[in-house]
UniProtKB/Swiss-Prot annotation:
Subcellular location: Secreted
Source organism of this protein record: Rattus norvegicus (Rat)
Main subcellular location: secreted
UniProt keyword terms in alphabetical order: Cleavage on pair of basic residues, Cytokine, Disulfide bond, Glycoprotein, Hormone, Secreted, Signal
Intrachain disulfide bonds: 198-205, 206-269, 235-300, 239-302
Signal peptide from the UniProt entry: 1-30
SMART domains: TGFB (SM00204)
Gene Ontology biological process terms from the UniProt entry: cellular response to chemical stress; energy homeostasis; GDF15-GFRAL signaling pathway; negative regulation of appetite; negative regulation of growth hormone receptor signaling pathway; negative regulation of leukocyte migration; negative regulation of multicellular organism growth; negative regulation of SMAD protein signal transduction
Protein name: Growth/differentiation factor 15
Gene name of the record: Gdf15
Family of this protein: Belongs to the TGF-beta family.
Induction, as annotated: Expression is up-regulated by obesity.
Role of this protein: Hormone produced in response to various stresses to confer information about those stresses to the brain, and trigger an aversive response, characterized by nausea and/or loss of appetite. The aversive response is both required to reduce continuing exposure to those stresses at the time of exposure and to promote avoidance behavior in the future. Acts by binding to its receptor, GFRAL, activating GFRAL-expressing neurons localized in the area postrema and nucleus tractus solitarius of the brainstem.
Amino acid sequence: MALRALHAQPTGGPQLRFLLFLLLLLLLLSWPSQGDALALPEQRRSLSESQLNPDELRGRFQDLLSRLHANQSREDSNSEPTPDPAVRILSPEVRLGSHGRLLLRVNRASLTQGLPEAYRVHRALLLLTPSSRPWDITRPLQRAISLQGPHARALRLRLAPPPDLAVLPSGGARLELHLRSAAGRGRRSAHLHPRDSCPLGPGRCCHLETVQATLEDLGWSDWVLSPRQLQLSMCVGECPHLYRSANTHALIKARLHGLQPDRVPAPCCVPSSYTPVVLMHRTDSGVSLQTYDDLVAQGCHCA
């Protein structure tokens, strides 16, 4: 009688508990161990020589390098190449209008001449004279481009200049246009692409250069065990005006260097990003693996 009553109970409850138990077991079995994920930077993992023989130590070193390269390859594959920004220097027509307004006329075709259609004006700086400070007219110019349409042969702007620029301009007005691809707006490429146009000539402007060096060359042979040879990428070259400026400070520095070269130095070619490198070296307690995040340059800019 009791056996029949037991069989008469619904079986959904025990089956559900059994499925939950299997699910929990699968989660525990698939949970990664502490050594499966590589955290950068990985700080000084000390290994006693008595605990690991050279083969095991070399194996761990190779495993660390493999995971590091896998992370880097995954990052590179997910990043899409961004078209390089471009700079245009134009000579607009500027004259004084009524009520102290400045009337600016710019040839529409000269804005993006020689560039793909995807390029748009990112920044516009007007210099009324060679010694005057730049006047940012980005928004008025972008508004004129939008309102006057793509078929207008010339863009006409009516501007109210700041008080210190409210003078009759000379014929040497310049308009500096910074253009970027619409597909890459808001992103700055960390890599130096070979199609960058250097005004000083090929290979003279800020770029990435790789140099092969041994531990003896670096003076590290007494404490670094591996690798015995390094491919060191570094930033070399000059920084002409408006070339690969890292930020607004670099733009101002380049501008002031042109006006006061004795007081303000030119921007320098420095790394914009780095590639992590793992070194195996000796420590007081044995041998250590350490990741260096600022040893090998990956991209360059002027700052």
